[in-house]
Design a protein with these regions (language model features):
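Zinc-dependent metallopeptidase catalytic helix centered on the HExxH motif
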Residues: 65, 70, 104, 109-173, ...
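Active-site-adjacent structural elements in folded domains
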Residues: 88, 117-122, 190-199, 212, ...
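Amphipathic alpha-helical substructures
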Residues: 79, 200-281, 286
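Intrinsically disordered, low-complexity linkers and stems that provide flexible hinges
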Residues: 1-29, 33, 308-344
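Hydrophobic helix-coil surface modules that form long, contiguous segments used
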Residues: 1-128
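Acidic/His/Gly-enriched intrinsically disordered linker/tail segments
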Residues: 148, 152-210, 235
Length: 344
């Protein structure tokens, strides 16, 4: 090769890395950089974009630093400090290549301009989702593709927490409930182990909605966020099985959440809350049960007016006296729980 026309570049990765996270980019790139100053150190931010997109990229990538600050709030420090954070313009939409994220969202909001993915919020979906993978998928990696929900469920949930951090709690609720539109319930999320089997693509949105459901089951946000950050920091730079994640949750929250994980991950259907009203004089009783797997154990949240209540259905019919009230004031909080509702 004519040395005048060739150039050799050497790159070093100082952390464990999955084989699929290694990539090669070749293009007419220009480089610009920034830093994220933190309490005890500085994270380098490097951007490689096609030369004619420099000005556009410099403006568009302003969203990176506040996003990283949100993720560090919930998941702990960026897990690849020594290698830095980078976005590299690519010919495809995106991929979570470790410390060298492929970016091809055309400097548009949403998913290549489609803000249905972002519940009409104007952030860049690819930047946020692929960056979430630095914690979920790159730092913490499943041992088997059958447990890929650990990557995609937690990463898709990272979008939800980003929205809460940047836009507030109510926008977060709108965002996470918008994810229901992408759930098909076609087959189980967890697939057969040791045979290179990947489960339903529902692992993305259903995984996120399951985690939001668990947050409301726990019903203690400071404890919930401590548990999420603890998982991200204690298991960083390691591989694990999905059952280890479930066991961690059970220990940390001192609850047996196994049946909730089983319902959402090992079966295609989500739990169904079945109910009816029975009138006795001027009073009403609520007759209710779960249609779910055996021994399914999860509270049901509902409001009567401004009062929030929790009940613990089983597969058997149960009865709760509600007294005299207007049935229009009865609201099942399926914005907090990912469930189906059947009124009989």
């Amino acid at each position: 090769i004519d040395n005048v026309l060739s150039r050799k570049s050497s790159w070093f990765v100082s952390y464990p890395i999955n084989s699929y996270n290694v990539t090669l980019y070749i293009g007419d790139y220009i480089h610009f950089s920034d830093v994220l100053v933190r309490e005890n150190d500085t994270l380098s931010l490097d951007y490689y974009v096609l030369s004619y997109n420099k000005e556009k990229a410099q403006n568009h990538f302003n969203q990176v630093k506040p996003m990283l600050e949100c993720f560090e709030k919930y998941f702990g420090p960026y897990p690849f400090l020594n290698d830095g954070y980078a976005l590299i313009e690519s010919s495809y939409l995106g991929m979570e290549h470790q410390s060298a994220i492929a970016y091809g969202n055309n400097y548009l909001p949403g998913y290549n301009g489609n803000t249905n993915y972002t519940a009409d919020l104007d952030f860049d979906f690819i930047i946020v989702h692929e960056t979430g993978h630095e914690w979920w998928g790159n730092s913490i990696t499943s041992n088997d593709i059958a447990d890929m929900w650990v990557h995609e469920g937690f990463c898709t949930y990272s979008e939800v927490l980003y929205v809460e951090c940047m836009y507030g709690y109510q926008k977060m609720l709108e965002y996470v409930n918008n994810q229901k539109n992408r759930v098909r319930n076609d087959k189980a999320v967890i697939c057969d182990f040791h045979v290179n089997c990947k489960g339903s693509s529902d692992m993305y949105s259903k995984g996120s909605l399951m985690l939001n459901t668990l947050r409301n089951v726990i019903n203690n946000d400071s404890l919930w966020f401590a548990g999420i950050k603890g998982l991200a920091t204690q298991k960083k730079h390691s591989t694990l099985d999905g059952v280890e994640v479930i066991n961690y949750f059970n220990r940390f929250f001192n609850l047996d959440l196994s049946k909730i994980f089983e319902q959402y991950l090992s079966h295609k259907d989500i739990p169904e809350f079945e109910y009816k009203f029975q009138k006795k004089g001027r009073s009403y009783s609520l007759i209710y049960r779960w249609n779910a797997i055996n021994d399914f154990d999860m509270p049901l949240i509902f409001n009567v007016g401004i009062n929030e209540k929790r009940i613990f259905p089983s597969s058997d019919w149960q009865e709760l006296s509600l007294g005299s009230f207007d049935k229009k004031d009865f609201v099942i909080r399926d914005d907090l729980l990912f469930i189906n509702i059947k009124k009989t």
